[in-house]
Amino acid sequence: AASYKVTFVTPSGTNTITCPADTYVLDAAEESGLDLPYSCRAGACSSCAGKVTAGAVNQEDGSFLEEEQMEAGWVLTCVAYPTSDVTIETHKEEDLTA
């Protein structure tokens, strides 16, 4: 499978990892030792919410986000596959639910 560079912009700094196209970005982050927020791991809540600022993801497995939210860049990292090199701002649940 193809792999993409996924950059996570977190409150404690920026980390770039390599994520296979068939791996959720949250799983790849954890395998790389990054500590990102999550809860259900099923795309049904907002704990892992982030904002895509560059690139693209496939998050068809998620159910929580509305179409408009996804079009605005919101992403649930637990159900997002990278479809290009992508940059994601993490720890965004408060902004999403505000």
Curated annotation (Swiss-Prot):
PROSITE patterns: 2FE2S_FER_1, 2FE2S_FER_2. Belongs to the 2Fe2S plant-type ferredoxin family. It is found in: Plastid, Chloroplast. One of its GO terms (biological process) is electron transport chain. It comes from Phytolacca americana (American pokeweed). Pfam families: Fer2. Its cofactor is [2Fe-2S] cluster. Ferredoxins are iron-sulfur proteins that transfer electrons in a wide variety of metabolic reactions. [2Fe-2S] cluster binds at C40, C45, C48, C78. One of its GO terms (molecular function) is metal ion binding. This is Ferredoxin-2. InterPro entries: 2Fe-2S_ferredoxin-like_sf, 2Fe-2S_ferredoxin-type, 2Fe2S_fd_BS, Beta-grasp_dom_sf, Fd_pln. Residues 4-94 form the 2Fe-2S ferredoxin-type domain. Binds 1 [2Fe-2S] cluster. NCBIfam families: fdx_plant. Keywords: 2Fe-2S, Chloroplast, Electron transport, Iron, Iron-sulfur, Metal-binding, Plastid, Transport. One of its GO terms (cellular component) is chloroplast stroma. Its main location: plastid.
